């Protein structure tokens, strides 16, 4: 027993008491051991927090390297509070600070590419980057949505969508667009009348009309007027949930929570539309919307496969590319991405178009003259694709508007691996890399007086040729916007049709020229307007 006691005492820790018997410990270590032994819970907490702050700062400084950015990061959150209320002036200052700049928000290290060449390099480097959106986006759009595909899988899926935006296809969608504009232009007149002729902020109305036009273009009349109105009203919640800085998780009664509920509603409605379209297309119905065109391609592909199985492929024309039969939910997801890609951008462009044409009666008069002429004096006459394409001045107005007030000012990507963007800077793997389009579109070396709205650049000038590499409104590279021709023709149809059916006045405020950032850009005062019926 004494031997056991002797052995046990021989292996007692030096921390068992404040004195260490015959162990000779330097006083510095003695002090540290004493402090650790007597440390309380809060001491440990503060020490851990200090270590985390130090790690956060060191990681930021190492990632930042030689590019422009704050010397130190606000612990953990970075400029998160500023990002909750994004200011265009703040973004512009960041872009102007250098070709590359950075910030760090929570765990995200963000590099901003501001020049034309830097932006183009990002757009054209699929080996290093892939498009990304906010953390909550897969929960809204669906984790298996095609927009999250990369490489060959993305290219192959995209090939099956290209046929939906050909000239022939776009002409089929025109009647649905005209119908929606006729309905909403009457609504604009009623709004002004109900307001007693006083100006009403129309930004939210433009969001609603562009959403309705998109729904009619994408899913036709498979969706009810009530459902279109509901989607148009609720899509604002989806946009708010997908802002660049937002909570990465869905908590009850947050923006993300409301956005998820709205997204689920849209997906459910579009799934119903897909089921109806399959029945109608299989019965030989005519194509009236994008969903019809895509499902018809699936049906034709299925017929060819069955003919091939029977050894009779020569009896059926082989579609190119061959598509599989997607289920209703997959179709719904894809159509939802079209709405996601178009809604905010076209809403922004529509708002600025109505504002700037009201401010520039010389421009509006020329648009009106061109459009009434092509309609042979009948303001209610629908347009064919040939007529729409012949509106050279109207299309120049749209082209310049998109340069002057580009709806999408930043396009977020994530680096798949370390990206040597310049000779002296490599963007770390996993960083968010954001090319901006605004600086390229306002480059004074390419565009004279770039801050001035001047449609003549594209009507009689050389902006198309000089700015061929600068016009990044729809991106470039493998992820360029599929619907860029559709978007521009749709906007030309809208403003041209409005010019012959309506008169409108912009009631300027001190904030009319200030830019509000809400996914895209809008006038800060939401564009107060009044409308009257055009009398010829």
UniProtKB/Swiss-Prot annotation:
Its cofactor is heme. It is found in: Endoplasmic reticulum membrane. It is an enzyme of class 1 (oxidoreductase). Pfam families: p450. InterPro entries: Cyt_P450 (IPR001128), Cyt_P450_CS (IPR017972), Cyt_P450_E_grp-IV (IPR002403), Cyt_P450_sf (IPR036396). It is a single-pass membrane protein. GO terms for molecular function: heme binding; iron ion binding; monooxygenase activity; oxidoreductase activity, acting on paired donors, with incorporation or reduction of molecular oxygen. Keywords: Endoplasmic reticulum, Heme, Iron, Lipid biosynthesis, Lipid metabolism, Membrane, Metal-binding, Monooxygenase, Oxidoreductase, Steroid biosynthesis, Steroid metabolism, Sterol biosynthesis, Sterol metabolism, Transmembrane, Transmembrane helix. It comes from the Eukaryota. The chain crosses the membrane at residues 41-61. Disruption phenotype: Leads to a severe decrease in conidiation and virulence when ERG5B is also deleted. The absence of both ERG5A and ERG5B seems not to affect the ergosterol production. Pathway: Steroid metabolism; ergosterol biosynthesis. It catalyses: 5-dehydroepisterol + NADPH + O2 + H(+) = ergosta-5,7,22,24(28)-tetraen-3beta-ol + NADP(+) + 2 H2O. Its main location: endoplasmic reticulum. One of its GO terms (cellular component) is endoplasmic reticulum membrane. Heme binds at residue 481. Gene3D superfamilies: Cytochrome P450. GO terms for biological process: sterol biosynthetic process. The third module or late pathway involves the ergosterol synthesis itself through consecutive reactions that mainly occur in the endoplasmic reticulum (ER) membrane. In Fusarium, the biosynthesis pathway of the sterol precursors leading to the prevalent sterol ergosterol differs from yeast. The ringsystem of lanosterol in S.cerevisiae is firstly demethylised in three enzymatic steps leading to the intermediate zymosterol and secondly a methyl group is added to zymosterol by the sterol 24-C-methyltransferase to form fecosterol. In Fusarium, lanosterol is firstly transmethylated by the sterol 24-C-methyltransferase leading to the intermediate eburicol and secondly demethylated in three steps to form fecosterol. PANTHER family: C-22 STEROL DESATURASE ERG5, CYTOCHROME P450 26. Belongs to the cytochrome P450 family. This is C-22 sterol desaturase ERG5A. The gene is ERG5A.
């Amino acid at each position: 027993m004494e031997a056991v006691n002797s052995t046990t005492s021989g292996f007692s820790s030096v921390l068992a008491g404040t004195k260490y018997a015959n162990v000779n410990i330097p006083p510095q270590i003695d002090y540290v051991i004493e402090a650790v032994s007597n440390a309380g819970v809060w001491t440990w907490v503060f020490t851990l927090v200090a270590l985390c702050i130090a790690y956060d700062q060191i990681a930021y400084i190492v990632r930042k390297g030689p590019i422009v950015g704050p010397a130190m990061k606000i612990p953990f959150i970075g400029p998160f509070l500023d990002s909750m209320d994004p200011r265009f002036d703040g973004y512009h200052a960041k872009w102007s600070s250098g070709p590359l700049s950075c910030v760090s928000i929570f765990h995200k290290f963000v590099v901003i590419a501001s020049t034309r060449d830097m932006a183009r390099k990002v757009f054209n480097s699929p080996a290093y980057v892939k498009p990304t959106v906010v953390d909550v986006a897969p929960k809204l759009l669906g984790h298996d949505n095609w927009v999250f595909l990369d490489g060959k899988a993305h290219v192959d899926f995209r090939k099956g969508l290209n046929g939906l935006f050909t000239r022939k296809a776009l002409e089929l969608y025109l009647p649905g667009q005209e119908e929606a504009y006729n309905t909403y232009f009457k609504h604009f007149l009623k709004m002004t009348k109900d307001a007693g002729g006083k100006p009403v902020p129309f930004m939210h109305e433009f969001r609603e009309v562009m959403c309705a036009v998109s729904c009619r273009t994408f899913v036709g009349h498979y969706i009810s007027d009530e459902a279109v109105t509901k989607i148009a009203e609720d899509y604002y919640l989806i946009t708010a949930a997908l802002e660049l800085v937002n909570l990465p998780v869905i908590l009850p009664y947050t923006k993300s929570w409301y956005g998820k509920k709205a997204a689920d509603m849209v997906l459910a409605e579009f799934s119903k539309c897909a089921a109806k379209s399959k029945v109608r297309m299989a019965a030989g119905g005519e194509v009236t919307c994008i969903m019809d065109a895509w499902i018809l391609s699936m049906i034709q592909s299925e017929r060819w496969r069955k003919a091939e199985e029977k050894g009779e492929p020569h009896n059926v024309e082989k579609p190119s590319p061959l598509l599989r039969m997607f289920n209703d939910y997959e179709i719904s997801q894809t159509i939802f991405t079209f709405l996601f890609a178009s809604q905010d951008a076209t809403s922004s462009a529509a708002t600025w178009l109505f504002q700037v044409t009201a401010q520039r009666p010389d421009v509006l008069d020329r648009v009106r003259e061109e459009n009434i002429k092509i309609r042979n004096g009948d303001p209610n006459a629908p347009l064919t694709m040939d007529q729409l394409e012949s509106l050279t001045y109207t299309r120049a107005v749209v082209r310049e508007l998109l340069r002057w007030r580009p709806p999408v000012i930043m396009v977020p990507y994530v680096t798949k691996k370390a990206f040597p963007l310049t000779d002296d800077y490599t963007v770390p793997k996993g960083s968010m890399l954001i090319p901006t389009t605004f600086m390229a579109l306002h480059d004074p070396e390419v565009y004279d007086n770039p801050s001035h709205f001047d449609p003549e650049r594209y009507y009689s000038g050389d902006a198309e040729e000089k700015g061929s590499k600068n016009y990044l409104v729809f991106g470039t590279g493998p992820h360029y916007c599929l619907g860029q021709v559709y978007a521009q023709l749709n906007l030309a149809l809208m403003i041209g049709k409005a010019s012959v059916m309506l008169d409108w006045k912009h009631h300027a405020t001190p904030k009319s020229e200030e830019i509000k950032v809400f996914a895209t850009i809008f006038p800060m005062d939401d564009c107060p307007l009044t409308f009257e019926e055009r009398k010829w």
